Amino acid sequence: MKKIEVIVRPELKDKTIAAIKKIGVGGVTVCHVQGQGSDDPPLVGQYFSKDLIICVVDDPKLNDILNAIAKVACTKTKGDGKVFVTAVEDALDICTQKRGTISI
């Protein structure tokens, strides 16, 4: 399993989530975040608003999901965002107590 963390422009959040769900991702977590990229001017207290979308997926879906995100979230403008992928050792559905990929 992989955890995908997608940082996107707020106006592209819904399109990005729709693209992810179209590939078969069951659920997502969404947070409003603020940050500053490495190329941004180092102005104290100035951050840019973004949305963070988090989901955990089966390994075989990873490339399709990354391609879908890139297709809908890219405006070819600085500040489009980032995607981070990390390995997930295990998962637990607290209610059903199912573990592993069946829990996602």
Residue ranges and their predicted role:
Residues 1-104:
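Positively charged, small/polar-rich N-terminal and surface patches that mediate targeting and assembly
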